[in-house]
Design a protein with these regions (language model features):
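Bacterial N-terminal signal peptides that target proteins for export
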Residues: 1-9
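Residue-level signal for mature regions of secreted extracellular proteins and peptides
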Residues: 10-14
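C-terminal motif of bacterial Sec signal peptides marking the signal peptidase cleavage site
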Residues: 16-19
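Bacterial signal peptide processing site
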Residues: 21-23
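Extracellular, repeat-based ectodomains that mediate carbohydrate processing or recognition
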Residues: 26-491
Length: 491
């Protein structure tokens, strides 16, 4: 039976030290920046991926390790209801498989993007997409939740053609069940019982890690669970509860893996959304996900970004829902360091911060430092490392180009372990996320401003690729056409 293990039990493996505890007595404040911000990166290609008439958001990105021209991105898709959308490219992002009528993961919802074609799933709503590839590139993976009544389930779909087609669903071609949940009458998105924000990581040995937060319905309790597959996604072990005790109001769990040792590092935040909690944690597995160390606090938010109206909205301007402060981890195999980027409000402006630790002692972290200090809010960050060179790549929604009023996307990169940074404006036109949204029949203006809770970035030898939510042409009465955008940027 999988269980939690103590930090001391894995000291001999070199992953953690004896002096660890659930929480250290203090955490350093952000360090003063001492590096360049003046350089710009190279060529930028921006493409509208979804190219349709209604909203998408939450845009994870994965690249085929055997064919870097093949990438997939997922989304929450509002074309028919709220479901799980997908697009694939086979030319490095210049063109993508269409959203309509077939850019949809079958087997989850009762509908598809084609009103004439019913879905092969049983769920009324789907969401929270996550994507990955197998180490040999032969299989693409897509996970998302399905919701119907009191019941929620997390499913994994597979593609053997780079994302053109996916597991058909239905009794003859079922998806793989990762885990199932019963909400006991509590609605999705309420203060009740529901799972949220899964992610997916595939290690070089093929092990698949899928963590999520599970809101229990008891105040702010939302421990992190993780399910692991050792057979290419055909089945999953019973989920393991990673966080416990006083570390229980958690969210935004992600896993990165050291390719040399196979050790898995799971990071999460201590439930910033709604203003609860202030800390970032890491847990380690040295046995391919069977057991996990106690959670170790490696950083503390000073004033976390929280964009979840009406509960919280702590930057200037009209309110909208968007990513708050969460940890984005990446592993550098050239230095054996675990990096984590996150946003925090420092001196009144939301900035990107970076901290790291040598995995020989995961309790010793660098002092968090502001990355390429900005004149406007940077309200979220995604992080990736190019494994051959150790180049650090970040993307963020950035209000620095408009007097801290409108959104753009910035790409920020470092080739010297964060000593200096180059920043590139990726978007050409700024926009106001409070003026666009997803369809909402119960909202006074017909929309709910919501650009999703995460974006996507991957690092290639000669470029970084990224996906995000941005505005499209309005069709009809309401500005509900949020699109998936892709960019490739040369460092």
């Amino acid at each position: 039976m999988p269980r939690l293990i103590s930090l001391a039990a894995i000291v001999s493996a070199g992953a953690l030290c004896v002096a660890c505890a659930h929480e250290p007595s203090s955490s350093p404040s952000p360090g003063s920046p001492s590096f360049s911000t003046s350089r710009s990166s190279g060529a930028v290609l921006v493409v509208n991926v979804s190219r349709d008439t209604t909203a998408q958001n939450e845009t994870p990105l994965a690249v085929n390790p055997a064919n870097p021209s093949n990438m997939i991105t997922g989304n929450n898709d509002w074309n028919y209801n709220d479901g799980c959308g997908v697009n694939a490219t086979f030319d490095g992002g210049r063109s993508w498989t269409p959203t309509l009528p077939s850019g949809f993961i079958p087997g989850i919802t009762q509908f598809t993007d084609d009103p004439a074609v019913p879905g092969t799933g049983i769920y009324e709503v789907g969401g929270d997409p996550a994507v990955a590839f197998s180490p040999d590139g032969a299989t693409a993976y897509f996970t998302c939740f399905g919701y119907v009544g009191k019941n929620v389930a997390l499913w994994l779909s597979r593609s053997s053609d780079g994302g053109r087609s996916w597991t058909a669903g239905g009794p003859d071609h079922p998806l793989t069940l990762v885990s199932a949940f019963q909400g006991e009458g509590k609605a999705r998105g309420s203060n009740g019982q529901f799972p949220d924000h899964e992610s997916i990581t595939v290690a070089n040995d093929g092990t698949i890690y899928v963590p999520w937060a599970h809101f229990t319905g008891f105040s702010a309790h939302s421990p992190i669970f993780i399910a692991v597959s050792h057979d290419g996604g055909t089945s999953f072990d019973l989920p393991v509860k990673v966080s416990s005790g006083s570390v229980r109001s958690d969210q935004d769990a992600r896993v990165v893996v050291d390719p040399a040792t196979g050790y898995a590092y799971l990071t999460f935040d201590n439930s910033v959304q709604g203003g609860k909690g202030t800390a970032l944690f890491v847990s380690v597995s040295t046995d391919r996900g069977a057991t996990w160390s106690k959670s170790f606090r490696f950083a503390t938010f000073q004033n976390p970004v929280c964009l979840y109206p009406p509960y919280c909205f702590n930057i200037s301007g009209a309110p909208f829902r968007a990513p708050g402060s969460y940890p984005a981890p990446a592993f550098d195999p050239t230095t054996h360091r675990l990096y984590v980027a996150y946003t925090d409000i420092v001196a009144g402006t939301a900035q990107v911060l970076l901290t790291s630790a040598d995995v020989s002692d995961i309790t010793q972290w660098s002092k968090p430092a502001i990355v390429a200090p900005a004149s406007g809010d940077r309200i979220n960050v995604e992080l990736s490392v190019e494994p051959g060179s150790g180049r650090l790549d970040l993307m963020t929604n950035d209000r620095s180009y408009s007097g801290n009023t409108l959104f753009d996307v910035s790409y920020i990169t470092s080739a010297d372990e964060g000593s200096s940074w180059a920043t590139t404006r990726v978007t050409k036109t700024s926009w106001d996320p409070s003026a666009y949204g997803v369809p909402c029949s119960s909202c006074a203006n017909g929309i709910r401003p919501f650009i999703g809770d995460y974006d996507g970035i991957i690092s290639l030898p000669g470029s970084a690729a990224m996906t995000w939510t941005g505005p499209g042409k309005t069709f009809g009465t309401y500005p509900t056409n949020l699109e998936v955008y892709f960019a490739s940027v040369s460092p």
